[in-house]
Structures are given as C-alpha cells and as structure tokens.
C-alpha cells in the first residue's frame, strides 16, 4: 500500500501521543468523557488531513494533465460551501465513534453499539463538538417566496426538505454489519444465504450488449431523457466523501485499490472483456454520510439540494451560490451571464472561477472553463449545459418583461417573482408533460392527476432509494450527442459526437455553434429504447470519461455499487413495499420479468431475487403499457413525486401562491415556447417529449401559445 508522506506524519504523531486513551472508568460499561474528547480530537486530525491531501492531489492532477476519469467525476461530486461543512461534521462523528469502538472492543465479548455506552451528556458533547448538532425549531417563515435552501417550507419543521439534510428512508437500511459497511465489503460474507456478485460481473453479463442491438424509441425524443436528468438535478445530489485516502491508514485508494473507508473499489471479475488485469479496479468512493441522529448510528446519506421541484438547478440550493449567480451590477433582478462569449448574440452561462478547471482538460488549446449554474453538474455534458443556458435566459426574459410591466419593482422583487414563475414552469412541465410519458397517461392521471392541496404532515424529502431509481434515464441515452442545423439536418462535420468525447466539453458550446443545434438534436432525435437485452450503451458502460485515461468508468457498475454503499434493500424488499409479488424461484422471476433467460442470468449471479440490486432489478422489468418504466419504478416515482407536490407549501396550484388569473396564464406554458423565446429556433416540436422526425410533429413558433404576464401587472 502507498502510504502518503503528509498523512504518514499525522498518523505517526497520533501514535506517539496515544490518543483515545484514558483512565479506565470506575463503573463497568461507562466511558470517561476525557476518552471521548481524545477520540473527537483524533478524528478531526485524521479527517482534516485526508480532506486537505485529497484537495491538493486532485488540483495537482488537473494542473499537470494527469487526471483520471474518477478525478473528473469526483471534482463534480465534491461537496462545497455549506455542504462541505455538514459532511465534515458527519465524518468527524463517524470516525470518532469508530475510534472509540476500536478502543472499547477489547473490553467487550462481542459486537456492541458504541452509542449505547455513552451518556446523554456525552452524546450531546459528541454532537456539538463534531458540528452535527441541529436545531429544527419553529420560526417565522415567509408566505410569499421560497427560501433558496428550502428551509421554512414546512413551518412546524423548518428543515424538512431543506438542503444539506439526510435523505428519507422508506425502508430500513441494510448493511453488512448492521450499521455502515456495505454488502460486498467482505467477500466471504453472505446475504440471504448467497454471496453477492461483483457489480462489474453483473454489468458484463446483463447490461452489456452489441451495438447492432441498439433500438431507437419510436415514442420518445431525446429531450424526454434530457428533461429527466435536468429535473433529477433539481431534486437530489448525494456528494461523495471529500477524502480520496483512507481516514485511518493514509492510503491513496485510487492507486492501490485498497478497500478502506471511504474507499470501496469496484473489483474486476475473471475474463473481463475490457480490463485484463484482475488485480486492477475501478475506483469508487462512498457517498458522504449524514450526521447520526440521537443513538441511531446506521449510516445514511445527505441530499445537498432542496427536495422540492423549485428550479434549484437554476438558482442554487445555498445562499452563497445564489448570490454568485445573480447579476449584482444593476438592480434589474437578472442572473449573471458570460462576459467573454455570446451565442449568436444571446447570453451564455458565466464561467466558474475554479483555480484548476477540469473542463480545460477536454481541449487544452480551446481553454474554455466550466460553466457556473445552480447545480455543480451543469457542465457534465453540452446537452445538460444547453438546458441550464436556456433556463438562465428564460429567467432574464421574465425579469425584463416584469420590469416593463412594473417599473417601480426593485431588483429583489423582480428576481423573486421571476424565480417564482420559473419554479411553476418546471413543476408544470414535469407533472403535466413528462411524468405521464414516464408512468403512462392513465396511471399518471390516477395516481398524480388530482391536486388536493398542501398537507404539512406529508414528508417531501427525497428518498434514498429514489436517488438510485431515477437513474433509469441512463438506459435512454444514445451513444452520440446529435447537433442539427436550422433545417434539422446533420450537415456539420461534427454533428454526431460520441458521448465519451462530450463530457465536460464546454468548449463545444462556445466554439461549435452554441445551444441551438443541441436543442434541435434533442427534439428531433429519438431516445434509446430500454430493452432487457440492450440496457446501457458502451459509451457509458466502458468509456465514461475515457478521454483522459485508459480505464474508463462503468456507469452500470457505479450505480449498483452506489446502491450497496447506500445500504439499500434488495429487489424483493422494494416490491413488497410497493405491494407487488416477490418472486422466489426461477419460474416466479421468469413470470415477473416475462423472460426466462434473463431470470436465469439473475439467479446464476445473485442466487435469490432478494439480493438483486435495486437499480438493475427495476430497469429489467417489462415496461408498463404506454410507460417507460415497469411496475416497481412506477410505484417509487409516484410515491416520490406525490410527496414533492403535496408536501410543498409553495406548489403552484396551492391557493394563495398565485392568483387565479396567474394560474390560468401559467397553464399555457410549454418547454417548446421557452425554446422559441430564448433561441434562434423558429420551428419546434409541438409535443416535445414524444419522438418526432422533422417535419412531422413540428410547427412554427407562432403556433405555440405565449405566457401572458399581464396578470402580474401591479401585484
């Protein structure tokens, strides 16, 4: 193992000082408070050292051009600002408890819960010293506008649904040790009587397919997939641990494939079709933990975003970011725009001011940095950046029009009213246009169709399982980014860019035609159809971020490893939660999947349907009529989106949020109109999420209804 010099020094100091030592307590089972204080102090040293080394290491690799695919991914998965503070506090607490448990273990005859031996004052000390202490008390909350952080949406529980809080658990977590270690951590450890397969083996045997088997979806456009990613980035983001080295060993996990917290590498199975060295691995780092509450030490993860459908991907989920995104040079309520480049006279997103920018790696001669938007992942692909650019422009268009109607409004009023309208737009497009095509129109009408009003007892938080389940959209990605000219033709020499050459390529927007060709490609190109024998294209399964190193990542394997990292129960537990049958053998699983060969592959790998990882099990189910998901995903999505609506005090249909005239005006908005109003595109898809081959299904912008803002005059 490679012990890093800087961390080695810290560890040596800790050993010499003999931390976490103290006088044996007088009463059996008790812990001296001085021992607890020593463990907290040691934990802070270890965590801070790991954080600092990792940050310097990633920046050095980016600066030198030796960054790996995981470095690129990690850069955008790193917690920042207030999220980083919350994550650091959780790591302090988890590491301190681990150190204390290690010290007390020789005095115990078997496994024990270390928090059970701490007194209430000691638990409070641990919570306060680590920074985990939270106050969720009633406070005065505005009835007019949302907060940026989502705080105060629920007046009785102001933190419910706010950013930087723990994800909801709809089922108890399942960890190998009952507390934190993911299943698969110990190779010999069985789950429900069977050894778990390596996630890369599952990817190879079930997800992998030859390119000639790829089928385009005759019913859905690529814009359908893209909206799914855009709305997902409105709802959830579970950052990874900021450490890339083991907390207690100082080992660089990417260089050694060491399995030490927070490192959980993806091992390579025999006869892997791409990675020939079985001792190699795909680096993987655990999601940052949330702070344990009370005596519950079972690991959970945080959501860095607000849980509401509120356009936070445009405005941010932290106050500091929201202020950076605003144009502070005037009082017009506008969002900031790029000061160096334009897109045919229209605004582009501002550049982020990263000291060592990963987007520069994708084209060193272009020297175009990453964009700055409300979500840190905005530059992941040009398609996603195009959506962020579109909605930044729409905010500024709304603010400008509102100022024309209300010249006495100040900048904050213009900003807040435009943001409020934007939130309603995202809600309407998602629930009226997108979800019926996900769930099937009849089912969506039955389960999500009628809004009965706000209920303060509804928990709107994003569920841990949703963060994995909503990755169903990965199965709809085509292997190329398509860009079309004004006649919807692929006429340019670079009109079809492989996905593996598009990640973090902000330069392609600046120097290769802006966002219009990308949006046309999303409207006029069909999505990939998810089939049981063709799930995920190799651009994502074998070449993810390959442009900077030989070993690209495997998105399917990452998804399954993440579900184990998060302690998510297996396939049958979630079917039971949804009131669905739980197959026990080959015959029953074959009936559920309507595919005996696939059922046999699953059982050969997992031994029992109980163990099938939620992501792969859910996307393998046959699609419901008119839907793009099977029954399990439909259940999970209905549950989550119903909670996000009914538990939102600022939902657009709630009486008092908008006037009756304003609600009527908002009901006419569409994503097609937003494109018409903010680009040079004059012919758009009328039903934008459905597959339309130009010119069929396309109309002139003059035929798309406009949003009439007269209802906002003088309000």
Swiss-Prot record:
InterPro entries recorded: Haem_peroxidase_animal, Haem_peroxidase_sf, Haem_peroxidase_sf_animal
GO CC annotation: extracellular exosome; extracellular region; extracellular space; secretory granule lumen
Site entry: Transition state stabilizer: 377
Record has Protease as a keyword: no
Residue numbers of 3'-nitrotyrosine PTMs: 488
Record's keyword terms, sorted: Calcium, Disease variant, Disulfide bond, Glycoprotein, Heme, Hydrogen peroxide, Iron, Metal-binding, Nitration, Oxidoreductase, Peroxidase, Signal
Propeptide: 18-139
Cofactor annotation comment: Binds 1 Ca(2+) ion per heterodimer. The ester linkage to Asp-232 was observed in 30% of the chains.
Molecular functions (GO terms): heme binding; lactoperoxidase activity; metal ion binding; peroxidase activity
Pfam families: An_peroxidase
Subcellular location: Cytoplasmic granule
Binding positions for heme b per the UniProt entry: 232, 380, 474
Residues reported in the UniProt entry to bind Ca(2+): 234, 306, 308, 310, 312
EC code(s) of this entry: 1.11.1.7
Major place of residence: cytoplasm
Active site, renumbered: 233 (proton acceptor)
Signal peptide: 1-17
GO biological process, one term: response to oxidative stress
PROSITE patterns cross-referenced by the UniProt entry: PEROXIDASE_1, PEROXIDASE_3
Family per record: Belongs to the peroxidase family. XPO subfamily.
Biological role: Mediates tyrosine nitration of secondary granule proteins in mature resting eosinophils. Shows significant inhibitory activity towards Mycobacterium tuberculosis H37Rv by inducing bacterial fragmentation and lysis.
Assembly behavior: Tetramer of two light chains and two heavy chains.
Stated name of the protein: Eosinophil peroxidase
Organism: Homo sapiens
Lineage of origin: Eukaryota, Metazoa, Chordata, Craniata, Vertebrata
Record gene name: EPX
């Amino acid at each position: 193992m490679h012990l890093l010099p800087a961390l080695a020094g810290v560890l040596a100091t800790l050993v010499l000082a003999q931390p976490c030592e103290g006088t044996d307590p007088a009463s059996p089972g008790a812990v001296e408070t001085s021992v607890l204080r020593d463990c907290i102090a040691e934990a802070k040293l270890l965590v801070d050292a790991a954080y600092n080394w990792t940050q310097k290491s990633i920046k050095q690799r980016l600066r030198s051009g030796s960054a790996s695919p995981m470095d690129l991914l990690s850069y955008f998965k790193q917690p920042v600002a207030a999220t980083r503070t919350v994550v650091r506090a959780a790591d302090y607490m988890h590491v301190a408890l681990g150190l204390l448990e290690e010290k007390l273990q020789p005095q115990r005859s078997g496994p024990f819960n270390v928090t059970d031996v701490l007194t209430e004052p000691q638990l409070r000390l641990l919570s306060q010293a680590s920074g985990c202490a939270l106050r969720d008390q009633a406070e005065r909350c505005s009835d007019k506008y949302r907060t940026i952080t989502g705080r105060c949406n629920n007046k009785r529980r102001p933190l419910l649904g706010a950013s930087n809080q723990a994800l909801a658990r709809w089922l108890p977590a399942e960890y190998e040790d009952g507390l934190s270690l993911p299943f698969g951590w110990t190779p010999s450890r069985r789950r429900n009587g069977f050894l778990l397969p390596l996630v890369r083996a599952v990817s190879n045997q079930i997800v992998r397919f030859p390119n000639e088997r790829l089928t385009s979806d005759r019913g859905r456009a690529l814009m359908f997939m893209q909206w799914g990613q855009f709305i997902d980035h409105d709802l959830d983001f579970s950052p990874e641990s900021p450490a890339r080295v083991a907390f207690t060993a100082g080992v660089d996990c990417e260089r050694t494939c060491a399995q030490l917290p927070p490192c959980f590498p993806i091992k390579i199975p025999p006869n892997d079709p791409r990675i020939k060295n079985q001792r190699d691995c795909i680096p993987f780092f655990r999601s940052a933990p949330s702070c344990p509450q009370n005596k519950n030490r079972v690991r959970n993860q945080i959501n860095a975003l607000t849980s509401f459908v509120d356009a936070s991907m445009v405005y941010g989920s932290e106050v500091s970011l929201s202020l950076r995104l605003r144009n502070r040079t005037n009082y017009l309520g506008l969002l900031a725009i790029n000061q160096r480049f334009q897109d045919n006279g229209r605004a582009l997103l501002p550049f982020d001011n990263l000291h060592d920018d990963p987007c520069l790696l994708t084209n060193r001669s272009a020297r175009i940095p990453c964009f700055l938007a409300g979500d840190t992942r905005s530059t992941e692909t040009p398609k996603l950046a195009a959506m962020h650019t579109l909605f930044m422009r729409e905010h500024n268009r709304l603010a400008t029009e509102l100022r024309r109607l209300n010249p006495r409004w100040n900048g904050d009023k213009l900003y807040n009213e435009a943001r409020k309208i934007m939130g309603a737009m995202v809600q309407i497009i998602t629930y009226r246009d997108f979800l019926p095509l996900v769930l099937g129109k009849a089912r969506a009408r039955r389960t999500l169709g009628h809004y009965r009003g706000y209920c303060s007892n509804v928990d709107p938080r994003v569920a841990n399982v949703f963060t994995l389940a909503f990755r169903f959209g990965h199965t709809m990605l085509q292997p190329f980014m398509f860009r079309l000219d004004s006649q919807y033709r692929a006429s340019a020499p670079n009109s079809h860019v492989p996905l593996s050459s598009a990640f973090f390529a902000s330069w392609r927007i600046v120097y290769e035609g802006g966002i219009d060709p990308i949006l046309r490609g999303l409207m006029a190109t069909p999505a990939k159809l998810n089939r049981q024998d063709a799930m995920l294209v190799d651009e994502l399964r074998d070449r993810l971020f390959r442009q900077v190193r030989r070993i690209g990542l495997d998105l399917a394997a990452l998804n399954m490893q993440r579900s184990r990292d998060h302690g998510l129960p297996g396939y049958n537990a979630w079917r039971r939660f949804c009131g669905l049958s739980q197959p026990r053998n080959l015959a029953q699983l074959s009936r559920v999947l309507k595919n005996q060969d696939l059922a046999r592959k699953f059982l050969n790998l997992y031994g029992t349907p109980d163990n099938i990882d939620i992501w792969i099990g859910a996307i393998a189910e046959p699609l419901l009529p008119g839907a793009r998901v099977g029954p399990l995903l439909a259940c999970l999505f209905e549950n989550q989106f119903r909670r996000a609506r009914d538990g939102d005090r600022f939902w657009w249909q709630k009486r008092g949020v908008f006037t009756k005239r304003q609600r009527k005006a908002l009901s006419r908005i569409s994503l097609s109109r937003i494109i018409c109003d903010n680009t040079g595109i004059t012919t758009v898809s009328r039903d934008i999420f459905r597959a339309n081959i130009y010119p069929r299904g396309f109309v002139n912008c003059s035929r798309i209804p406009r949003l009439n803002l007269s209802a906002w005059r003088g309000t």
